[in-house]
Amino acid sequence: MPLVKRNIEPRHLCRGALPEGITSELECVTNSTLAAIIRQLSSLSKHAEDIFGELFNEANNFYIRANSLQDRIDRLAVKVTQLDSTVEEVSLQDINMKKAFKSSTVQDQQVVSKNSIPNPVADIYNQSDKPPPLNILTPYRDDKKDGLKFYTDPSYFFDLWKEKMLQDTEDKRKEKRRQKEQKRIDGTTREVKKVRKARNRRQEWNMMAYDKELRPDNRLSQSVYHGASSEGSLSPDTRSHASDVTDYSYPATPNHSLHPQPVTPSYAAGDVPPHGPASQAAEHEYRPPSASARHMALNRPQQPPPPPPPQAPEGSQASAPMAPADYGMLPAQIIEYYNPSGPPPPPPPPVIPSAQTAFVSPLQMPMQPPFPASASSTHAAPPHPPSTGLLVTAPPPPGPPPPPPGPPGPGSSLSSSPMHGPPVAEAKRQEPAQPPISDARSDLLAAIRMGIQLKKVQEQREQEAKREPVGNDVATILSRRIAVEYSDSDDDSEFDENDWSD
């Protein structure tokens, strides 16, 4: 049904009942028709005033917009004509301080509303009957709904359409989120292909170059070929040959290199350092051929040995600092190297379980009781690191002064005082009881974690702000639905906990 915006009254000129007692009926009808025409002319003039008033307002708006546009054009023309790029330079600060121009297109929304209703329509609306005053019952309702909306609700159809559009938009968003999760699950359950192992062609050709009789052991070649992983770790076969050097040793430092360092063994009065076939037999008895050959290759003489230092009196503890020794070297080899010639050796030393147990760290090896001074072979006992142990020896004959102590290393502080297992363990137990020390790195880590939490809260607030309806009009709702349908990424998805995890 078309809405009549302007209606000229009266619509009928000659229709009307004549009053009784009129002698001249023709004259009465003529006068009433003329009066109706005058009323129509007055109504027409009123509508004309409204029409020209609206035209004037529209023209005034166009004039104001044209003037503002002309002012901007004039200012731009002045800047363009007077700008000299060789002399005047635009600073980056000025560019960043000013916002770029953005056109704001205002779409026509809610054309038929109470604010935009024209005057003639407002007059017609005011002439209609008023609805019953049902709004006075609103305070007595439990659901707090407006009582008048049950009788007449101008926004009923719009609210119904809005609810339907928002529901469709939410359904599409959930469908896209479900498809995204399905793709993620399908991507994680795909078959994992096995990576082919790399072949060492050079090693194979080197093995083929040997004759079958001279070819190395097959087990050793396989361990060399297959033992090294991508990180460079050794297999158990190859690691077994280097265990005597690597196990029970201090971390690699300049003081603990592969070359032998000067060692000063302690001897009792009248004792002679052993050398010769007996010590070699003891060495070969407890070490495999491969390990002994490896140690003979590593323990080449690099410098002449220094003389032994004078010993402390009997019953005192060894407090003189000693140079760090290479623990990959057996005591028999050390004594044999430092004493190429001398008196006949004493009887062979007692049997020890293995070469590795002789070099147990001082924290793991229990303390041994001191031997009497009359013992014929003090040095034949199971050896232990030179930084530990209590040696009860007789005063040695006067000799040259002891060598200067080596550079401070991991073992220098240990050799200055006797070591005992229980006090060190107690100190280790007391360390966790100390309060944590706050430094710059811990503060930085705490600041980073706080920043991550703040970022999570900020993103959650942004997501909540996006979920709220921006506008209550048709254009905004439709644009939001189109954006959800044609967007590739799910911008309105829930916050992912995998991002910025601790």
UniProtKB/Swiss-Prot annotation:
It comes from Homo sapiens. Keywords: Actin-binding, Coiled coil, Cytoplasm, Cytoskeleton, Phosphoprotein. The gene is WASF3. Phosphorylation by ABL1 promotes lamellipodia formation and cell migration. GO terms for biological process: actin cytoskeleton organization; actin filament polymerization; cytoskeleton organization; lamellipodium assembly; modification of postsynaptic actin cytoskeleton; oligodendrocyte development; positive regulation of Arp2/3 complex-mediated actin nucleation; positive regulation of myelination. Belongs to the SCAR/WAVE family. The modification Phosphotyrosine is found at residues 151, 248, 337, 486. The keyword Phosphoprotein applies. The lineage of its organism: Eukaryota, Metazoa, Chordata, Craniata, Vertebrata. Downstream effector molecules involved in the transmission of signals from tyrosine kinase receptors and small GTPases to the actin cytoskeleton. Plays a role in the regulation of cell morphology and cytoskeletal organization. Required in the control of cell shape. Binds actin and the Arp2/3 complex. Residues 223-237 have a biased composition (Polar residues). SMART domains: WH2. Residues 182-192 have a biased composition (Basic and acidic residues). This is Actin-binding protein WASF3. Binds the Arp2/3 complex through the C-terminal region and actin through verprolin homology (VPH) domain. Residues 411-423 have a biased composition (Low complexity).
